[in-house]
């Protein structure tokens, strides 16, 4: 049975994704002091506990980025407060180092993503990279993705990220990424796996397809990206302690950059597909249409540039041009027909 202190902590967090992250950081504190369990933390004298948290902050200042430390402490505050332990949090926050300008804000270029894909030697890894590149999802979304969250829409796919969670949002896959995902699922079926709506979208490596499928973890995806980047030679330039492009987030940044620079893209829809809330939107946009159809119509505008393969992108652009030509020809034919009818009417009069 779970200890009551942990049950209170978990029940006080609404978002499943946040719960996982907070628990991870609570465990870091517990392991740092080699504490037996969660309830034993609460048995420590308040003054001693205050010193422990302060020392923990000062230790992290010698090891971690200044921007990381608050994210390690806020979960502790949530745990202690919901268990009625009062610490001097203002004093603790005064120990935080000054934040620094974040490095690693650059996005992967399309050419770099091509290199990454060339170093993905199995269908799963290729599908994961294209999934992130075309949907903009965080690496932390993968453990929660089920097949029921992914549905065909035209020649693309609709994806529900963090479904049934307060952070739920809709994004999409390009035709290129959709095909890679379908190829990966087909491989799993051929290996003997029975797929249903509750099957993980991406499963851990397996020897036999019949084995019970377990979702990939965030660590699995991150370590895969680390290996691929090392093999591709793309992890060389550092800014201080960080690389210019974040390992996983560089794909999400690429999505964000492309979709917001797309001609005639509605920014508020772009933010929704990126999983951002929009508290500062103008009043007249608070009633904007965020239906799947509306979001997909905006997403389609960005498909050519989100597509990684050059020949696929050129094919999409050519198809779009041919569609415009066909529409123009139909319009011209209608005008010609209308003019012909008018001439016939004039002659009859």
Task: List the model feature ranges, each with a label.
Residues 132-155, 267-272:
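Short, charged phosphate-coordinating catalytic segments
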Residues 175-242:
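Active-site/catalytic core of tyrosine-dependent DNA strand-transfer enzymes
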